Structure formats: C-alpha cells, structure tokens
C-alpha cells in the first residue's frame, strides 16, 4: 500500500463518519457551480441553467452519491486503487469521453466538502492523508488516458 498504517487509520476512521449521499451531492453540485462548463456532461439530467437548478436537481445529487460511494471503494482497496478503478477508467475514457482533469478537480472538491462536513475530525494529518488518496484515485481513473 502507498499509505502508511497511520494514514490508513485516518482515512478509514473519517470515512466511517461520512454521509455519502449528503457529501456526494454537495461535491458534484459544487463542481458544476464552480466550473459551470462541466454541466455539459450532465445535460441529460434536465435543466441546469442556474446554480439553483444544479443545487435542486435530484439526478445531480443522486449521481454525486454514486460517485462518492465509488470513491469510498478506494478506502476498502487502499492497496490496489489502480486495479480497482481500471474498469471505471476505461468507461470514462471510451464511453463518456470525460477529460481526466475532472478527476483531480472533483477530488479537490471532495476534500473541501469533507472538511466542511467534519471540521473537528479533519485535522491537518487527515487532510494530508485524504489529499494523497484523491491523488491516487485521480491517477487510477486517468490510467486509460495514457
């Protein structure tokens, strides 16, 4: 594993407290509000013209939950993140044509949301461990692109 035993403990302990639906919905909504041009990937989810449309779109919140649940799988596979995400990498590259830069952007937003939802637990050490995790997940999801 690329993570120390201490980093693994910090990641697993915080992740046990995460409300995936709430944090996932917040993370994807934030991404589409901060980077509105990313909304083109979700046009089939209905009207997303305004920030309020994004915030109140159930399909966006539901997909955010799905994305964060998938991210949570990395927590269970810290020793083989790349292997675990091989299929999703291929899918996002071949079918969805998602720019791999999005994985890094969303990873950074997930960090912000975790910090907002868990301010007492989100210590500097926990932040560092999760930053490392999102880097590894983004690299794994980008593997098919190289």
Curated annotation (Swiss-Prot):
Residues binding heme b: 63, 92
Pfam family, one: Globin
Superkingdom to which the source organism belongs: Eukaryota
Molecular-function GO term, any one: peroxidase activity
Summary of the tissues where the protein is detected: Red blood cells.
Role description: Involved in oxygen transport from the lung to the various peripheral tissues.
Record's subunit section: Heterotetramer of two alpha chains and two beta chains.
This protein's name: Hemoglobin subunit beta
Source organism per UniProt: Caiman crocodilus
